[in-house]
Amino acid sequence: PLKNMVLSRDCIWLSAGYCVAIRGAEMWRKQNGTNPYPVVLGVRSSVFLPYKQLGLVIVDEEHESSYKQKEPAPRYNGRDAAIMLGKMSGAKILLGSATPSFESYQNALSGKYGFVQLTTRYGEVMMPELLFVDMKEYRRKKMMKGSFTPVLYEEMKRVLENGMQVILFQNRRGYSTYLQCDRCGSILKCKHCDVSMTYYRYRNTLNCHYCGSLRAVPAMCQECGQGHYVNRTPGTERIEEDVKQYFPEARVARMDLDVMSNKAKFRALIDDFESGNLDVLIGTQMVSKGLDFERVKLVGVMDADSLMGFPDFRAEERAYDMLMQVSGRSGRKGERGKVVIQLTDMQSRVYQLVRKENYREFYTQLSQEREMFNYPPFSRLILVELRHMDGVVLRNAANELARLLRERLERRVCGPAEPDVSRVRKMYRIQILIKAEQGLSLSKLKAFL
């Protein structure tokens, strides 16, 4: 679309696999030659290609956590690398987002960045109507239709009868995110990782999303030997089954990493949905990323609570971002759309602020807490992670390292503490967090470490 609208010369689109595995060397030679591509559309690794006359760097959806590469090394933030590339090249830099990261928003408010705010939606279309639905009441009254509250069910029925389309968002893959014994309550976990295994009904297996191990579903509970495992917390596969059960005439497709194994499948699904060959699209966060379908008049968030509760100071920011982004898929053209958000914690401040659709107020409230506890954007964080197959050895080493760090860095050191998933691929993990306030020399700190 970009090439058709504004370009008269060649451009190249780079995915991670295309750039790195297949054509990396060829692209490098092309960009270093006398006739480089004038426009490169790429993932985060594209910032490391050579550019001779770079004039503009655009980072779309700059708030996205996927710009960070955590594993394997080198670990970097693609957005920050793009900003540095632009500065080194003397190019203009444009960061775009409806829900900017706190770091970028702080830079804009302080005058470090220029700030352009769009106060109306493209085409002057009204923002969708948000409906927050308390699942607790409907579950208590046994009024749920599978994964759907009566409110979402009726809205889906109305939209589908009018020949329009629906997007359902559930940020969990598989049929069930974990299996639990109906007698003793134990949860079936991976043998190599400290995490529950996801159940896939279509192949009747359990899969660990951390190490990739597979196992069959045991006939009886592995702990008490008497109970049976039951499904808990539905994933996209279960949502797809529910849609087919309650809306048998609807044409349904699923968009997640389990079915979108390559670019061709992704493109084919998008084309089918855009052309009206599908009625309901179910997906994980993939459905929230910049998709533009004019016939989508309803977005359903199946379980908003699953976006919260993570031991991460950015958890509320990411939940807000995700809800606002996925809500933006509804009613992008023509009549106003609707968004039905199913949840149980109706008092959460994140949901109250999403209802107001006021990012400035959201930022103000959370940034006050971050400043109080010295978190970004008011500090820089260094995460030190230690791993070992022996948990006792690891704990002793982590305690000693933390003691040595505190001798120099004092209260800047937090931990050691176990992360949410404390064991991956048979390796135990412990983390130490260092908070470096504004003005502290990071080069000296890194040299000390």
Where are these regions (language model features)?
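Short beta-strand elements
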Residues: 409-419
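Short, low-order "capping/linker" segments at domain edges
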Residues: 422-435
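Structured alpha/beta or helical-core interaction and ligand-binding surfaces enriched in interleaved
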Residues: 413, 437-438, 446-449
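Inter-lobe coupling/hinge segments of SF2-like helicase ATPases
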Residues: 1-38, 42-395, 403, 431-432, ...
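Short amphipathic alpha-helices in soluble, non-transmembrane regions
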Residues: 397-403, 442-449
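Short, flexible, solvent-exposed loop/turn segments with mixed acidic/basic and small polar residues
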Residues: 371-376, 419-425
